[in-house]
Amino acid sequence: MTLLALGINHKTAPVSLRERVTFSPESMDQALNSLLQQPLVQGGVVLSTCNRTELYLSVEQQENLHEQLTAWLCNYHKLSPDDVRQSLYWHHGNDAVRHLMRVASGLDSQVLGEPQILGQVKKAFAESQRGQSLSSELERLFQKSFSVAKRVRTETEIGASAVSVAFAACSLARQIFESLSELHVLLVGAGETIELVARHLREHQVKHMIIANRTRERAQSLASEVGAEVITLPEIDARLADADIIISSTASPLPIIGKGMVERALKTRRNQPMLFIDIAVPRDIEPEVGKLSNAYLYSVDDLQAIIQHNMAQRQAAAVQAESIVQQESMNFMTWLRAQGAVETIRDYRSQAEQVRSEMTAKALVAIEQGANVEQVINELAYKLTNRLIHAPTKSLQQAASDGDMERLQLLRDSLGLDQH
């Protein structure tokens, strides 16, 4: 048995290919059942996200293993092997172990250190667990990978710094205000970036969120999810004074928030400070706003500078994380190699126990029939010794007959003959 990881990801295949090789949640049971019907496959986990599709398998090693698994993948997705062959990567043994640990820890992600992948790996594991498609080796590997990912998060700073615009905007707000729990936030727009910002802010339990958008309908579903109030863009002027933090990201060709609007809001607020974060290009907030006292304006360029600084910090943390993964993968392989002896030891003990049981039973019968106890015990010891050393003796004789001194020495070591 060997462990194998194969797949495609954002580094080896464009989205046009990745989307053709995905496994939907609805089809996962069917895919796992089909995979386990392959003669060489003893257990499997399928990880399928927007950036990667990977199979983690325990398999019987054979020369045509790659061809068989490529054929299965292509048949399942109705593709030609030529479509995927150049994009597929293969990891065996320790490389497969290390790859999964890197994936779970966010070290192989498009955004270095992103935490979402760990949840996706756990979900894939749970699917295989539910479908009873795990081998004992795979189960141990995934459980170990989860603990490695946790260790990487705990012992390094790989997840501490913002490397997305949305996360950077929220991090900036937390740096300036420390706690967000008593603050009111106005979000302008309802696109993907604002969605991410809203979810980050909800996690930090802001007191109140307002989402301003050109149409209420577009913003309503997001507002329902994060518990926000919805207003239209023309209502911003009247509500701006309510906000301590304003984060804007629309596709408007002209500014939505002007200097005069902010001046009126500051007057109403009696000059309590306001933080403006403008993520939009073109800008949603007039640059002159940043010149007002108690109005602090940051643009998308300011956020990019923060992101670049934070990415450098993550890359430094990744070096430490890679060291953890290397150490833990070696520890796992030590355990895995030891498992190779478990079945042999179990069989050997079972055989010895069977011999002991049979010969003890015969000895007890002899004693019950009146035989001399001392003679029975001596005979039992003699026969038991001969039975137990018979197979090793034959192996020693064969090794000597073959002139195989290396095997002869290995047998001597196994039998403890050179121990003093």
From Swiss-Prot:
Q: Which GO terms describe its molecular function?
A: glutamyl-tRNA reductase activity; NADP binding
Q: Pfam families under this entry? A: GlutR_dimer, GlutR_N, Shikimate_DH
Site-annotated residues for Important for activity: 99
Q: Per the record's keyword annotation, is Oxidoreductase included, yes or no?
A: yes
Instruction: Give the EC number(s) under which this enzyme is classified.
Output: 1.2.1.70
Query: Which EC main class describes this enzyme?
Result: oxidoreductase
Biological processes per GO annotation: protoporphyrinogen IX biosynthetic process from glutamate
Any domain commentary?
A: Possesses an unusual extended V-shaped dimeric structure with each monomer consisting of three distinct domains arranged along a curved 'spinal' alpha-helix. The N-terminal catalytic domain specifically recognizes the glutamate moiety of the substrate. The second domain is the NADPH-binding domain, and the third C-terminal domain is responsible for dimerization.
Name of the protein this chain belongs to:
Glutamyl-tRNA reductase
**Species per Swiss-Prot/TrEMBL record:** Yersinia pestis
- What lineage does UniProt assign to this protein's organism? Bacteria, Pseudomonadati, Pseudomonadota, Gammaproteobacteria, Enterobacterales
